[in-house]
C-alpha cells in the first residue's frame, strides 16, 4: 500500500538530506504533464527525453518537490530551491529509481512472476493469471495488453512500464487483493533497471529470436539483457524453455533452473517434459513427465508454440506449489489470449486467425502451427513496422513465401517511413515477388483474401493482434484486425 514518507527517509541510503525531513512524499511522477498539487516530480534522463527540461513546468503544476538526475558525481546530493520548491540531485538516478519507488509503494504479501523472451510473454502471463483464478486464487497481469485483472485491463504504454509505474501499479493491485501478479519483463525494462528492486517468486524464459536490434545492436547483447532477469535480480525459480538453444545453455548455468521441453530430456537435474503431444481442432493434449510426476494436460489452444507456452505456465505454477490435480482439472477451461492465434470463423468462409506475430520467429511459428490445421491453402497477410529493425523485413517475407501458399503484403505501423519503401524491403526477400499481392490497406487486404480464399483455407492476419490502432505519419488512427475479421465475416463483436 502507499504511504506518505519524508523525503529524507525516501532517499536513504542514497542521499543524506535531513533538511528535507519535513517534505512528505505520497506520489511520484515522471511525466510532468501528469503532475498534480502535492506530487513529487522525478526528472530522469531517459533514452530519448531529458526530464530535467520539465522541472519548471512540474513546479508550476504544483509539485511539492523534485528528485532529479545529477549531471555527475560531484552534483550528487546537492539541493536547489526553485520557487520555494526543493530540487534534490542524485547521481545515476535511473539505476536506483526502482528501489526508491519500492520504498514508497509496498505490496508485502504478493508473489511476482516475471516472464521474459522474444515471443510468448503475453500468452504465458495471461495463461498463468487465468489458471490461478480457475484454482481459486486472485492474479493480475502487467504487460503488452494492459495492467490489472484480466476482466478489467488498463491500457499500458509499454510492455514493461517505468520504474515508478510498476511499483505504483503493484501496490494498487495488492490493495485490490491480488495474491499474484505475472509481469512481462522486456529487455528494455531489464537494461534500464525498471524492475531492479522486484523480488520474483519465479522467472520464465520463453525463447530468443531477432527483435529490438535497433536498440541492443547485436543478438548477444539482446540475450545478455534477458539473462539479467535470472542473474542480476532476485528470482527464486528459473523456468527455462530448453528447446530454445539459448535457454538450454542458460539452464545448465543456473542452479535454480527447471528445464521445460516438448521432448523427453535427461540432461537437466530438474525438468518437466512432454513425452507425447497431440494437436487437434479441440486443442492441445500433452502427456508429460519429469520432476513433478506424470500426467495428461489438455487445453483449447492451437499450435506447437502454444504447447510450449502451456508447459511453461504449468511448470511455473507447479514450482510455486499449486496442486497438480487442480491444475489438470481446470486446464480445459483456459481461453486463448486476445489477439494471440485468435480464431474467427463463419459458415462457408475461410477461417481467419489474428495473431500478434511481428518477428521472423513468431511468423514462422504461427504459420507452422496453422499448417497442421489447414486442409486447403494457407494465406499470410502481414506487414513490417516503420522506424524499426529493417533487416527483418526480407526475412519475414521469405518465411511467409516458404511456409504459406498465398502471400499478401500490407502495412503494419509505418510510423514516419514511406509504406511503399517498407514493402519494397519485404519484396526483396521473395523468390517470386510478382506472385505476392500488395495491398497497403489492412482491411482491404483481408477483404481480398476472403473473397479469393476457399472455405477450407486459413488466413493468418499477423502483426497487430490485440492492437486497435495504426501509426502513420506521426498520427495514431483507430484500426483493429479483430474488428476487421468480425466485420468481414459478419460476426457480432
Swiss-Prot record:
Residues that bind ATP: 117-123
Cofactor entry: Mg(2+)
One Pfam family, short name: Mur_ligase
GO molecular function, a single term: UDP-N-acetylmuramoylalanyl-D-glutamate-2,6-diaminopimelate ligase activity
Residues annotated to bind meso-2,6-diaminopimelate: 388, 412-415, 463, 467
HAMAP family, per database record: MurE
UniProt function note: Catalyzes the addition of meso-diaminopimelic acid to the nucleotide precursor UDP-N-acetylmuramoyl-L-alanyl-D-glutamate (UMAG) in the biosynthesis of bacterial cell-wall peptidoglycan.
Family indicated by similarity: Belongs to the MurCDEF family. MurE subfamily.
Protein name (Swiss-Prot/TrEMBL): UDP-N-acetylmuramoyl-L-alanyl-D-glutamate--2,6-diaminopimelate ligase
Amino acid at each position: 500500500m502507499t504511504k506518505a514518507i519524508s523525503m529524507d527517509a525516501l532517499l536513504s541510503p542514497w542521499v543524506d538530506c535531513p533538511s528535507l525531513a519535513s517534505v512528505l512524499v505520497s506520489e511520484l511522477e515522471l511525466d510532468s504533464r501528469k503532475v498534480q498539487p502535492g506530487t513529487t516530480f522525478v526528472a530522469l534522463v531517459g533514452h530519448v527525453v531529458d526530464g530535467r527540461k520539465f522541472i519548471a513546468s512540474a513546479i508550476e503544476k504544483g509539485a511539492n518537490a523534485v528528485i532529479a538526475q545529477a549531471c555527475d558525481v560531484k552534483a550528487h546530493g546537492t539541493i536547489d530551491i526553485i520557487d520555494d520548491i526543493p530540487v534534490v540531485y542524485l547521481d545515476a538516478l535511473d539505476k536506483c529509481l526502482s528501489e526508491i519507488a519500492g520504498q514508497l509503494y509496498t505490496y508485502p504479501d504478493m508473489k511476482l512472476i516475471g516472464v521474459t523472451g522474444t515471443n510468448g510473454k503475453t500468452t504465458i502471463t495471461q495463461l498463468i493469471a487465468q489458471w490461478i483464478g480457475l484454482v481459486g486464487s486472485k492474479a493480475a497481469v502487467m504487460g503488452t495488453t494492459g495492467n490489472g485483472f484480466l476482466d478489467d485491463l488498463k491500457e499500458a504504454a509499454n510492455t514493461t512500464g517505468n520504474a515508478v509505474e510498476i511499483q505504483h501499479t503493484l501496490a494498487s493491485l495488492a490493495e485490490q487483493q491480488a495474491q499474484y501478479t505475472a509481469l512481462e519483463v522486456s529487455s528494455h525494462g531489464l537494461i534500464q533497471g525498471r524492475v531492479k528492486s522486484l523480488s520474483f517468486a519465479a522467472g520464465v524464459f520463453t525463447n530468443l529470436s531477432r527483435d529490438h536490434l535497433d536498440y541492443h545492436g547485436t543478438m548477444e547483447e539482446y540475450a545478455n539483457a534477458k539473462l539479467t532477469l535470472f542473474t542480476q535480480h532476485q528470482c527464486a525459480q528459473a523456468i527455462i524453455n530448453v528447446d530454445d538453444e539459448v535457454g538450454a545453455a542458460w539452464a545448465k548455468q543456473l542452479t535454480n533452473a527447471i528445464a521445460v521441453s516438448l521432448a523427453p530430456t535427461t540432461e537437466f537435474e530438474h525438468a518437466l517434459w512432454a513425452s507425447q503431444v497431440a494437436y487437434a481442432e479441440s486443442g492441445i493434449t500433452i502427456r508429460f513427465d519429469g520432476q513433478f510426476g506424470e500426467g495428461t494436460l489438455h487445453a483449447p489452444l492451437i499450435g506447437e508454440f502454444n504447447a510450449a507456452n502451456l508447459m511453461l505456465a504449468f511448470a511455473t505454477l507447479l514450482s510455486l506449489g499449486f496442486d497438480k490435480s487442480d491444475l489438470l482439472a481446470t486446464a480445459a477451461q483456459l481461453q486463448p489470449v486476445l489477439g494471440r492465434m485468435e480464431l474467427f470463423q463463419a459458415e462457408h468462409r475461410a477461417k481467419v486467425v489474428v495473431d500478434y506475430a511481428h518477428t521472423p520467429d513468431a511468423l514462422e511459428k504461427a504459420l507452422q502451427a496453422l499448417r497442421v490445421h489447414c486442409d486447403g491453402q494457407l494465406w499470410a497477410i502481414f506487414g513490417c513496422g516503420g522506424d524499426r529493425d529493417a533487416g527483418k523485413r526480407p526475412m519475414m517475407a521469405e518465411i511467409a513465401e516458404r511456409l504459406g501458399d498465398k502471400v499478401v503484403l500490407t502495412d503494419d505501423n509505418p510510423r514516419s517511413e514511406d509504406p511503399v519503401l517498407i514493402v519494397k524491403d519485404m519484396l526483396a526477400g521473395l523468390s517470386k515477388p510478382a506472385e505476392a499481392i500488395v495491398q497497403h490497406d489492412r482491411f482491404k487486404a483481408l477483404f481480398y483474401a476472403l473473397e479469393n480464399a476457399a472455405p477450407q483455407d486459413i488466413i493468418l492476419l499477423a502483426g497487430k493482434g490485440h492492437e486497435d490502432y495504426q501509426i502513420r505519419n506521426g498520427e495514431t488512427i483507430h484500426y483493429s484486425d479483430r474488428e476487421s475479421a468480425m466485420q468481414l465475416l459478419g460476426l457480432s463483436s
